């Protein structure tokens, strides 16, 4: 394996190489490559998002985050169908992520929920056909981030331009990387494979319904940062109930641990570098191969931003309450939903929770 190929490995792959190292020299080499990868990734992410902030305004830095997520995921991941059709779907997904979250914010919570259901139905049914690829962690997360950080007026006009640029970049990279691959299925096959008795379709419907309902309830209860509850719900909804239970436990424990760690750092560090706690969390995520640890470090970035608006106590209370509500509601919703949905004997779609 070349140096460049090793840089392309995910956290689990890099850690597996470290574990299998037979000599200290080999282990030190793999550790060095791993550290270079983390540093290069962080530097690139910081540079990329900063460019979007400069071009389209600080209030649209979240656009840089969403575009970056899509670029990093879809340079490797696919939609399981013909490359040309997949590219057109990606362009459609960007239109949906640009328009629907903004419109939903203009409506009442209930009407917004209905629009969110319709938007997520397209994203999930056509973009998340293979649960093992976790495309929902990109598409639905991107949608929720844009929903939570909505803008108006001139800022929204700049967001339109930023998302158009992001769509062009993502579609270009996706098509270039996948054009030589052969796919036997097309868009029509995705529609024909919709089956409410299959574990995949039930999982998709759960995502489509549960996440907008969580957002709606949080907003009706006047809970700030409703997107946190939606993101928490999205992240734990899986085809396997066993995996769901695992993620619910890890999400709750991870967020509480993250809150404690953030609070300690908040009091130990000078106020001038509070913003860098989020970057520290990003580095931690880079070293984390397991969901539980990712939940811990993801908390840093969210709290670093929220603490500026709500103060430390308010941000911590919101983070814990929104996450516990989101994952517990999602688990209860899916248990009831799966219970009432028709069943058939089939080979279950398996998605590991790690």
Locate the predicted segments by residue.
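Transmembrane helical segments that form the transport core of multi-pass membrane transport proteins
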Residues: 212-265, 269
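Cytoplasmic-side transmembrane-helix entry/capping segments in multi-pass membrane proteins
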Residues: 83-92, 131-142, 249-257, 297, ...
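Membrane-interface helix-loop-helix junctions at boundaries between adjacent transmembrane segments
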Residues: 101-192, 196
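Transmembrane alpha-helical segments of multi-pass membrane transport proteins and ion-pumping complexes
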Residues: 42-50, 54, 90-102, 116-125, ...
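Intrinsically disordered, low-complexity non-transmembrane regions of multi-pass membrane transporters
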Residues: 1-35, 178-201, 342-354
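Membrane-helix interface and helix-disruption motif detector
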Residues: 51-59, 84, 97-111, 153-162, ...
